[in-house]
Amino acid sequence: MLSHRNLIANAFHYMTTVPQREDDLMLVMAPLFHAAGSNGVIANIWTLGTQVTLAAFDPKIALDLIQTHDITESLGVPTMLAAIAEEQHARPRKTDSLKLLVHGGSPIATEVLRRTHTAFPAAELVEVYGATELSPICTILTNEQE
């Protein structure tokens, strides 16, 4: 069982590597019933950021929300990043507000990283690794470290 202290410590660990700001707008693509989705928003809540959630993942809707709300950050699994990158290449939207794309949950292919970076050149790609019993994040790799 995870304690509140575990979750807060994990959010603090995340924020020391990936600074959060009050004016951040996070698109939550990961399901909130999963550790990535629920714990992924704690740092954003802590810093008084705003979350926009998807009822179900759809790359077209995700990109429309990024454009409409000037989303600054998002998180998801590599297949989600691949899907939004391909949709952005096929039907570009204004996404220059997007400064951070966090991914984890499974390995990410080099080609997916490349396509995502070319689709969202203003966004830093950050990889997280963890497990639910770790509260959940234990390793964070920024652009520089990848």
Describe the residue ranges of each PLM region.
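Alpha-helix capping/helix-boundary segments
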Residues: 58, 79-81, 108
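Gly/Ser/Thr-rich phosphate-binding loop
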Residues: 46, 71-76, 85-146
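Residues at the C-termini of beta-strands that transition into short coil/loop
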Residues: 30, 36, 55, 105, ...
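Active-site phosphate/pyrophosphate- and oxyanion-stabilizing loops and adjacent acidic/basic residues
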Residues: 12, 82, 114
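Nucleotide donor/acceptor-binding cores
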Residues: 24, 30, 99
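Conserved AMP-binding/adenylation subdomain of ANL enzymes
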Residues: 8-25, 33-73, 87
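Conserved AMP-binding A3 loop
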Residues: 1-12, 141
